[in-house]
């Protein structure tokens, strides 16, 4: 059995990448593997809930303080003090390297291209590293098109979501890009009958998911008796654009 360290992109469960990897961890534990997770510290009740959720499936979490957890040029907040951010990046790599050594990790897996610290730490410790890619290198994630060589060099194996993404990425890499299917456990529930008709959009409000187009389409529907509901987190700048249009 293996001892596997995951690097998570967010300290939340409001996105598909995080949800799918949570259930992958659960499955790996059921197979007898030991799973540990590293993500960034956010503190307070949200972090406590996150930690409890992972404890339920037997995963130990490490929460590392940082200025920005993703690449400097990735979406998700601007870096105001580059020197401070660089210092945290270095510290995060060192901390992950120590976690690898202390826990005798056999494999490091980075979930999404947005986190790179685990790739460097795994290389320092001479431990295999897998990269799971969920994003197309365009629109808000276009920044990582310039990092293809780095991603390839610091990956023992590359994986992307099966289908269009895998077809898109395959010619960009010299190394084979394996495919995987994101998995989420679903509970069957009987829906309550209601009197209100709603259009419901579930998922993080981001430019990549382009909910603004749904809002515009809803406007053309011109049916005030039908509600449009969004459920999930949001990127502040994109939410402001949607709010302004509304």
Which residues fall in each region the model found?
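Short beta-strand->alpha-helix junction loop in the catalytic core
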Residues: 67, 137, 164-165, 180-189, ...
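A conserved mid-protein helix/loop that constitutes part of the nucleotide-sugar donor-binding site
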Residues: 15-23, 197, 206-220
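Glycosyltransferase donor-sugar binding loop
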Residues: 38-46, 202, 227-243
């Amino acid at each position: 059995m293996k001892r596997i360290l995951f690097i998570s992109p967010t300290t939340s469960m409001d996105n598909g990448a995080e949800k799918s990897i949570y259930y992958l961890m659960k499955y790996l534990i059921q197979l007898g593997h030991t799973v540990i997770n590293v993500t960034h510290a956010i503190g307070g009740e949200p972090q406590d809930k996150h930690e409890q959720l992972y404890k339920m499936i037997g995963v130990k979490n490490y929460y590392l303080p940082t200025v920005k957890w993703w690449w400097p040029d990735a979406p998700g907040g601007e870096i105001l003090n580059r020197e401070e951010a660089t210092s945290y990046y270095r510290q995060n790599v060192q901390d992950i390297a120590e976690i690898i050594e202390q826990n005798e990790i056999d494999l490091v897996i980075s979930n999404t291209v947005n986190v790179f610290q685990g790739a460097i730490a795994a290389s320092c410790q001479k431990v295999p590293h897998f990269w799971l890619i969920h994003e197309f290198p365009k629109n808000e994630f276009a920044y990582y098109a310039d990092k293809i060589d780095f991603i390839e060099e610091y990956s023992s194996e590359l994986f992307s979501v099966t289908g269009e993404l895998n077809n898109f990425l395959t010619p960009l890499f010299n190394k084979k890009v394996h495919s995987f299917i994101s998995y989420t456990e679903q509970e069957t529930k009987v829906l309550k009958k209601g009197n209100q008709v709603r259009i419901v959009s579930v998922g993080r409000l981001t430019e990549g998911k382009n909910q603004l187009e749904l809002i515009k389409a809803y406007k053309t529907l011109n049916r005030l008796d039908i509600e449009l509901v969004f459920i999930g987190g949001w990127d502040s700048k994109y939410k402001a654009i949607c709010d302004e249009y509304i």
